């Protein structure tokens, strides 16, 4: 009788190698060389030696993890957050702020093939004025998890503190946890958002089943005792205001109202400096006509209108156009108009563009602005400021302007998200005479 044996599972022992790290990439990974190949190692810093094992081996590069660190960089710091290394929110708390800024600036300079002229930064801790915390009910313990996703996973890190949040929001975390953990609807909660506006603190609760009257009463009592504006979201389309007025924030001396679900820059300090520097770079004169593309609800548009003869803001989301118009009225600005347009189409043929523009500002999403670069070139502005949240699409879009005779006059790294791998930037293009 034939007998069949299952093959023994092959076991491979990963080789331990010793490496010296010579660089830090913009994502906070140590960069070393081994056998002529670039090696990326999370958790290591320049000037550090370590024993590592290779976890992924590609043709051009490899990834490794630390087995034992043999030396420490003088720029290594003790992370402030007890969740660092598990939570996916921050990647660089182990590095000095100066090293973080240098590595991001170097990465930006390489992509843009141009020197970074300045870093626009603010406080490195307590800067984040918005947080979205995932909620998950654990049947075994009958407890509610509240926190951020683990690095590279959909699992939740139960967050007790978060030092990058503005102090008002960090102080709220245990109170929000206790309130939500006492609700009958604990099993049917999706996430909670906390927003710190100039007007006050907002709490937006996403729930997937109707709330009982007892739960609603608990939430209302909590919002009143903590001085919160409370919003309930039974689905992705509906937002019910339970308490509070229209929120607003200050932007360079102006008051901008927004809906709790509207995008606002999470770093208020860097946003203020970024807007001020953009106006300075554009060198706005009282007789200038200025165009603001991807304008949102007027973060740049309205401050521009305080200096220019006229400003046109163009946006693809109708609700944001309406909000921009409302903010212009609230601030008594009559020289600014907002238009809803598909920015993939040629907007230079619109009636509002017939007189051209002296200066142009654009602040697109991560996908960049490939569809509008030729339109901007047609308008022949003297100066262009491009604000970017994705250096790769910025580099791609810049090529069109450089080929059309523009040059990079200034390049800034925006340290909008300290301790993370996010890299934002701003470029001034000038037309060659």
Curated annotation (Swiss-Prot):
UniProt superkingdom: Bacteria
Biological processes annotated in GO: rRNA base methylation
List of catalytic residues: 389 (nucleophile)
Binding locations of S-adenosyl-L-methionine: 265, 294, 299, 315, 342, 363
GO terms for MF: 4 iron, 4 sulfur cluster binding; iron ion binding; RNA binding; rRNA (uridine-C5-)-methyltransferase activity
E.C. numbers: 2.1.1.190
All copies of domain TRAM, residue ranges: 10-68
InterPro entries with a match to the protein in the record: 23S_rRNA_MeTrfase_RlmD, MeTrfase_TrmA_AS, MeTrfase_TrmA_CS, NA-bd_OB-fold, SAM-dependent_MTases_sf, TRAM_dom, U5_MeTrfase_fam
Binding site for [4Fe-4S] cluster: 81, 87, 90, 162
HAMAP family tied to this protein: 23SrRNA_methyltr_RlmD (MF_01010)
UniProt record similarity statement: Belongs to the class I-like SAM-binding methyltransferase superfamily. RNA M5U methyltransferase family. RlmD subfamily.
Function of the protein: Catalyzes the formation of 5-methyl-uridine at position 1939 (m5U1939) in 23S rRNA.
Protein name per Swiss-Prot or TrEMBL: 23S rRNA (uracil(1939)-C(5))-methyltransferase RlmD
Source organism per UniProt: Escherichia coli O6:H1 (strain CFT073 / ATCC 700928 / UPEC)
Originating gene: rlmD
């Amino acid at each position: 009788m034939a007998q069949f044996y299952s093959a023994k599972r092959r076991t491979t022992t990963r080789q331990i190698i010793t490496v010296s790290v010579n660089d830090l990439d913009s994502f906070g990974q140590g960069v070393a060389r081994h056998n002529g190949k670039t090696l990326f190692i999370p958790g290591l810093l320049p000037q550090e030696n370590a024993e590592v094992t290779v976890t992924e081996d590609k043709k051009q590069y490899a990834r490794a993890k630390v087995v034992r660190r043999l030396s420490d960089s003088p720029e290594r710091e003790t992370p402030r957050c007890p969740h660092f290394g598990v939570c996916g929110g921050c990647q660089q708390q182990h590095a000095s702020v100066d090293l973080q800024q240098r590595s991001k600036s170097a990465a930006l300079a390489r992509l843009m093939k141009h020197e970074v002229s300045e870093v626009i930064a603010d406080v490195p801790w307590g800067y984040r004025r918005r947080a979205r915390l995932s909620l998950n009910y654990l049947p075994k313990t009958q407890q509610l998890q509240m926190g951020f996703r683990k690095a590279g996973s959909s699992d939740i890190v139960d967050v007790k503190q978060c030092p990058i949040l503005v102090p008002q929001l960090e102080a709220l975390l245990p109170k929000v946890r206790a309130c939500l953990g006492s609700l009958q609807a604990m099993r049917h909660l999706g996430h909670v958002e906390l927003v710190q506006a100039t007007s006050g603190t907002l709490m937006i609760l996403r729930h997937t089943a109707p709330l009982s009257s007892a739960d609603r009463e608990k939430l209302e009592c909590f919002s009143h005792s903590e001085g919160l504006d409370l919003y309930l979201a039974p689905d992705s389309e509906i937002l019910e205001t339970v308490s509070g007025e229209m929120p607003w924030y200050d932007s360079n001396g102006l008051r901008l109202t927004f809906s709790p679900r509207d995008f606002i820059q999470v770093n208020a300090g860097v946003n203020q400096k970024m807007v001020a520097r953009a106006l300075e770079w554009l060198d706005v004169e009282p007789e200038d006509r200025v165009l603001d593309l991807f304008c949102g609800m007027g973060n740049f548009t309205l401050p521009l209108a305080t200096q220019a003869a006229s400003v046109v803001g163009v946006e693809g989301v109708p609700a944001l156009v309406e909000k921009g118009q409302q903010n212009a009225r609230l601030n008594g600005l009559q020289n600014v108009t907002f238009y809803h347009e598909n920015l993939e189409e040629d907007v230079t043929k619109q009636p509002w563009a017939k007189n051209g523009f002296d200066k142009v500002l654009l602040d697109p999403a991560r996908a960049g602005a490939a569809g509008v670069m030729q339109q901007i070139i047609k308008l022949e502005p003297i100066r262009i400021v491009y604000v970017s949240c994705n250096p790769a699409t910025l580099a791609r879009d810049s090529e069109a302007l450089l080929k059309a005779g523009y040059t990079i006059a200034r390049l800034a790294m925006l340290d909008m998200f300290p301790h993370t791998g996010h890299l934002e930037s701003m470029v001034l293009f000038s037309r060659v005479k």
